């Protein structure tokens, strides 16, 4: 039960929830804490002033905000709690849990009213302190949020089991111990709060005050309040809306927004969701059991490592003492290596024990909380939180997936001392990675017919010789740096196929592979030469035959037919080839089509009448098609995207099934050169803030782009934009997006800069400088946005120009900041 306690505490005050309410994001807040973190919104910024009156804000329209940009021009505008500035006349303070609390903008309520019952200022806004989602309250104020009766029941049972002292429910800071309870108000008071909020005069003089212990008993014996509809407070929930995933009353079905929705019986859905949560808990329980057994195994490994270390050190000392004085100088070095290996193993195992212990404690707490929730007999209250709990249970179960319950370190010391060398070889005395006399694996064979390159990625495949009798524990793939430098390991594992991404375009790499087991490593395979893409399109390599030479070449041939160009970079990729070669096509340059005649040799093209924005001339020239097409194209990558991302249009169009921001990357990474791509806004509802930019391959996929240090982005709404990296917001710029808008991203790795464009106009200054490394195009969005990579070709941004000379098209100059 102790692990469950953190599930029962408010993220604002840090105490047990008191009168918890459920926010649209499924998180909970004390009603008093919710009032403390309200922020009043000016009339000009409210949604009612931007839309027709009476439209209202639904429970799930919390993305329809102006991102809290209300107090300062330097404000970032994103609803990240504690990250926006307050007005100079509005001091703010932090709660014990570190959440920034704003005082109410209205005068304090009368003393005879509790804070939970006081009127909410008009156009008040509340931000969830856990997920940082913001919502402007409607006329109902906090009464529009449903009460979490199930959570209240769980907290009551938990406190009774702990015999905890009852706390005052009206203390603004750390709650004091309650001294009385009012049976009519159903509120616990300390002495100062009782005198201030419940004076013994007027109507309150007739209220009966009892000791807290007696009040707890009477509260437990009294029937729990039935959850009522938030839209119709006098009606109880009677049905369950399948589309909105919430209980509703009969008036909602007759005249409310659920009248055309599919509904089901409340009791049936209650049983169904209880069954789903129970099934999810079964899987999580199995994971928790495995984790406990795994922790026992890890603790046993600590003892085994200690014993093996002592045994190994004794053997080492015995061998070194038998040698002459020259060996004694070497002995100290060898002992140091053993101790280092010993400490390394212990550190790895202890770190894994600590990690698994924390994860197991969190899992156990969630299980206990879910079991207590299942015991509740309130269908309506249960259904309000069941979906969120089921998702959390599945997510926690997935975190115990493959590899989590595998030891990261072995208990054996795979070292042995060879004491046979003569004294003249004493300076070469060292450990050998051998403890048995079994042979090393045979040299792997590269399967050339399965090796290929695609854009800036290379796929290699290998196998063991057919007649080999020695098993390999794994393989080590090595690649040089593309410039003839030293080899480095890019893969270590049991698989016999590996795809290496993020290579330089138009570069040559050398690859080799070797096998290993407990005895040692095999010799290297033959060296394979890889040539990455130097042309647009997707090309497959031809099968290759094995040769007797030590070096083999993996070709990247120009195909006889070229696929339509989907996505190209850099700026010189404004050529748009629709049909396959040979034949006729059209040249799309600044929306002006010009006929091209394509030579069958595919070496050049003629563009009569093309105006390349030189001073006044109109050119008819031969352009080197090899250089013109030395670009990359890409689509969105379903493999690395968040599971909520929805793909269409050959992975060129994406949207999301969640109200939360989710990240999707492009398939191709860039590490040098100048690259530009555009995205169009196909759908834009409720003024969300999608983000566009670049990211590392390991960027967080479940939050807005730029929230971590792995992404560089611009997020934009219908009025303005900001640049964001590592959750730092800069350069607020006026001008937003609507449906049909175009977002351009210019990644200049030669100058190490990142620039953004909106509707062909540069948005703000150069967004980021000193960017270097491997970057992937990236977008974050939610279900209110749909974007597409610009197809069928690219356009040059306003202010960009091209230089044209016979036989070549050069890369453009970047627009002036």
From Swiss-Prot:
Chain residue ranges for the region called Disordered: 535-557
Gene3D superfamilies hit by this protein: 1.20.5.170, 2.60.120.920, 4.10.830.40, Classic Zinc Finger, Immunoglobulins, Zinc/RING finger domain, C3HC4 (zinc finger)
Keyword Metal-binding (UniProt): yes
Keywords: Cell projection, Coiled coil, Cytoplasm, Cytoplasmic vesicle, Cytoskeleton, Metal-binding, Phosphoprotein, Repeat, Synapse, Transferase, Ubl conjugation, Ubl conjugation pathway, Zinc, Zinc-finger
UniProt domain B30.2/SPRY: residue ranges: 613-794
Pathways involved: Protein modification; protein ubiquitination
Post-translational modification Phosphoserine, affected residues: 44, 46, 49, 53
Catalytic activity field: S-ubiquitinyl-[E2 ubiquitin-conjugating enzyme]-L-cysteine + [acceptor protein]-L-lysine = [E2 ubiquitin-conjugating enzyme]-L-cysteine + N(6)-ubiquitinyl-[acceptor protein]-L-lysine
Coiled coil: 273-340
Protein function: E3 ubiquitin-protein ligase which ubiquitinates itself in cooperation with an E2 enzyme UBE2D2/UBC4 and serves as a targeting signal for proteasomal degradation. May play a role in regulation of neuronal functions. May act as a regulator of synaptic vesicle exocytosis by controlling the availability of SNAP25 for the SNARE complex formation.
Record remark: domains: The coiled coil domain mediates the interaction with the N-terminal t-SNARE domain of SNAP25.
Subunit structure comment from the entry: Interacts with SNAP25.
This protein's name: E3 ubiquitin-protein ligase TRIM9
Originating organism: Mus musculus
